[in-house]
Amino acid sequence: MKKSILFIFLSVLSFSPFAQDAKPAGSSKEKITLESKKCNIVKKNNESSPESMNSSNYCCELCCNPACTGCY
């Protein structure tokens, strides 16, 4: 019984702010800038491609990650 209580206490304590570092290990004061990437791809007009996909979506999927902010 004492071992189980000790185990529960230690597991709860590990999630407390005292057990966590106050400063993240990879933190630095260096500024990071995102570079915009312009895609120069012309979409071919195929009948097999869906009409709902516009050229900017097509460009973003091919050149960079769609979640990236620099895609336009």
Swiss-Prot record:
Q: What is this protein called?
A: Heat-stable enterotoxin A2
- Proregion positions: 20-53
Alphabetized Pfam families for the sequence: Enterotoxin_ST
Where does it localize?
A: Secreted
Higher taxonomy: Bacteria, Pseudomonadati, Pseudomonadota, Gammaproteobacteria, Enterobacterales
- Entry similarity comment: Belongs to the heat-stable enterotoxin family.
As for what it does, the entry says: Toxin which activates the particulate form of guanylate cyclase and increases cyclic GMP levels within the host intestinal epithelial cells.
Q: Might you report a single GO cellular component term?
A: extracellular space
- One of the record's GO molecular function terms: toxin activity
Give the species this sequence originates from.
Answer: Escherichia coli
Keyword Glycoprotein on this protein?
A: no
